[in-house]
Amino acid sequence: MRIAISGTHCIGKSTLIGEFLRTHAEFVHEPEPYIVLVEDFGEEFGAEPSVEDFYRQLEFNVERLRLHAPGERVIYERCPIDFLAYIAVLDSGAIEPALGLVSESINQLDRIVYLPLADDDEMDVEFPKLRKAVDGRLSAIYREDAFGLVSASGIEVVEATGSTEERLRSIGF
């Protein structure tokens, strides 16, 4: 089972995965591409979000998806759709190459767990307008099948809301 936790920044992906791994040690954790690229490979990203930076993270995410065969137990911190959403929000004219890469790679997953932004979530975070806009784009992709990715791939998408414990139950293990 290859599961990706999807959502805008500062939504609780890391917390959810940490709790999941406490009781599911048999799963391999694929961390956030940004963290791996910076800490393990020494790559540098701009202080301001950019299409180029998110496209690089998308490429890396796709590489990591291809490393794991069907049947392996892997939990990914982000999925290609996340990066598509960021790119679409930053520059809708730049989505074509990203869309192609996402549609080719999404079938490497068995399930996506989408963490939507709650209406009352007013955290003090970096780039709050970007955070909200990306959540809106993710919502359109998952709930309304924008770009046709979900229907074309047949991937199972689960929406997880509430506390960390409630979200854990949504993962399905």
Where are these regions (language model features)?
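Pre-Walker A (Motif I) flank of P-loop NTPase domains
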Residues: 1-2
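Hydrophobic anchor at the beta1->P-loop junction of P-loop NTPases
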Residues: 5
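The conserved Walker
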Residues: 9
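Conserved lysine of the Walker
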Residues: 13
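Conserved substrate/cofactor phosphate-moiety recognition/catalytic segment
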Residues: 18-64
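Short loop/turn segments at strand-loop or loop-helix junctions that form parts
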Residues: 32, 77-81, 113-119
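Glycine-rich phosphate-binding loop used to anchor ATP phosphates in small-molecule kinases
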Residues: 54-107
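A glycine- and Lys/Arg-enriched "phosphate-lid" helix/loop adjacent to the NTP-binding pocket
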Residues: 90-146, 154-162
